[in-house]
């Protein structure tokens, strides 16, 4: 595999990165393998006129080949030094809208006027899961997402019931999105090389989920409780929330372990909790 510092197509176009040291507090690992970069951009398949948003462009390894195909790109970067470099980049600055911000604090619905957002990035591993759940709040405005993540996280996102990787993020993300791992990325593709394998995943929010649920916040809260102690049964983990006989009425074995329940199972329990809490609130209001 040939290596460079984020692409040398423009003969000096990426020189702007020189001298930047990866910052641990931002979880920075910079992609620098041309072959892997091309595979990732092919998977994204950016086209002119699309509402493309890159999170954490870093040294522009994905930014350059993406904007070559799309002509324009929004980038969200928290690191002030990298923002300045991108704003003064001799080849990219005119094609970029650079937003200095923490992606976790951004309301992505503000970009919806320009069409469904296509979001991608080599995410810092320390914010990857919170950021995905943050973006799912704006799923109606997002066409798809392509993220570089730890392979372990991608395995969890795509895991099926019964596997050791299956957990709360599997349920939360699969309820909202089609999940497809698309590119495997070795540590050698980064500077500095991380200690873990990486993978790029494609997340496509459903227009209509095959796993409908009335309250996603309720579902996420339920999964947090259910998977808190994986070795215990659902009866045990949810005893403060759902009576065992109610689980049976929903077609769920109370003696099952949390990782054996399907996404639909969790959605049914969540909907019962939503209805149950509404009923209790109505009864409380009537008694006042």
UniProtKB/Swiss-Prot annotation:
SUPFAM superfamilies: S-adenosyl-L-methionine-dependent methyltransferases
Annotated catalysed reactions: adenosine(1518)/adenosine(1519) in 16S rRNA + 4 S-adenosyl-L-methionine = N(6)-dimethyladenosine(1518)/N(6)-dimethyladenosine(1519) in 16S rRNA + 4 S-adenosyl-L-homocysteine + 4 H(+)
Residues engaged in binding S-adenosyl-L-methionine: 29, 31, 56, 77, 102, 122
Enzyme Commission number: 2.1.1.182
Biased composition regions of type Polar residues, renumbered to the chain: 1-14
Biological role: Specifically dimethylates two adjacent adenosines (A1518 and A1519) in the loop of a conserved hairpin near the 3'-end of 16S rRNA in the 30S particle. May play a critical role in biogenesis of 30S subunits.
PANTHER family (alphabetical): DIMETHYLADENOSINE TRANSFERASE (PTHR11727), DIMETHYLADENOSINE TRANSFERASE-RELATED (PTHR11727:SF7)
NCBIfam families (alphabetical): ksgA
Record's protein name: Ribosomal RNA small subunit methyltransferase A
